[in-house]
């Protein structure tokens, strides 16, 4: 499982011009699920993200978590995070989990975040989406589990 975590001032995801999810201050999560991932990875990722201190306090130190700042999450499934680029010029996605299992696990991940008291908006699994965001920092972390 790979999650790209971006601290944002605001973010939105649109499908065919219609906004399906949007947040103000918070985290944009790009979520890639690999073959072999399961509940263990989903729970660990949700715990880590819920507790991660990546927002600045009054002193400018990254001491605050998303709940501390009243932030929201926009979760977007993105299988291309599992691209293998070692050979040739065309990325291979053989390590990415296939639907419908990947869709189910992404939904479980989002529910784990909600269980931890977080507000979660989402894109739509498998859709052609346009993601708009304003990075804060920029502050980006890649979480591999």
Swiss-Prot record:
Catalyzed reaction equations: glycyl-tRNA(Ala) + H2O = tRNA(Ala) + glycine + H(+); a D-aminoacyl-tRNA + H2O = a tRNA + a D-alpha-amino acid + H(+)
GO BP terms: D-amino acid catabolic process
Localization, UniProt: Cytoplasm
Keyword Flavoprotein attributed: no
Alphabetically ordered keywords of this record: Cytoplasm, Hydrolase, RNA-binding, tRNA-binding
Any one GO molecular-function label of the UniProt entry: Gly-tRNA(Ala) deacylase activity
Entry EC number(s): 3.1.1.96
InterPro entries to which the protein is assigned, alphabetical: Daa-tRNA_deacyls_DTD, DTD-like_sf
Functional summary from the UniProt entry: An aminoacyl-tRNA editing enzyme that deacylates mischarged D-aminoacyl-tRNAs. Also deacylates mischarged glycyl-tRNA(Ala), protecting cells against glycine mischarging by AlaRS. Acts via tRNA-based rather than protein-based catalysis; rejects L-amino acids rather than detecting D-amino acids in the active site. By recycling D-aminoacyl-tRNA to D-amino acids and free tRNA molecules, this enzyme counteracts the toxicity associated with the formation of D-aminoacyl-tRNA entities in vivo and helps enforce protein L-homochirality.
Protein name: D-aminoacyl-tRNA deacylase
Organism: Lactobacillus delbrueckii subsp. bulgaricus (strain ATCC 11842 / DSM 20081 / BCRC 10696 / JCM 1002 / NBRC 13953 / NCIMB 11778 / NCTC 12712 / WDCM 00102 / Lb 14)
């Amino acid at each position: 499982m790979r999650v790209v975590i971006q601290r944002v001032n605001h973010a939105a995801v649109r499908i065919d011009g219609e906004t399906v999810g949007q947040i103000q201050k918070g985290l944009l999560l790009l979520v890639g699920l690999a073959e072999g991932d399961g509940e263990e990875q989903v729970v660990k990722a949700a715990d880590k993200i819920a507790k991660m201190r990546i927002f600045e306090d009054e002193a400018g130190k990254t001491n605050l978590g998303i709940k501390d700042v009243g932030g929201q999450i926009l979760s977007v499934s993105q299988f291309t995070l599992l691209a293998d680029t070692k050979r040739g010029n065309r990325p291979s996605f053989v390590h990415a989990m296939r639907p419908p299992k990947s869709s189910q696990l992404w939904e479980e991940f989002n529910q784990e975040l909600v269980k931890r008291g977080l507000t979660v908006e989402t894109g739509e699994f498998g859709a052609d989406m346009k993601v708009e965001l304003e990075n804060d920092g920029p502050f980006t972390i890649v979480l591999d589990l």
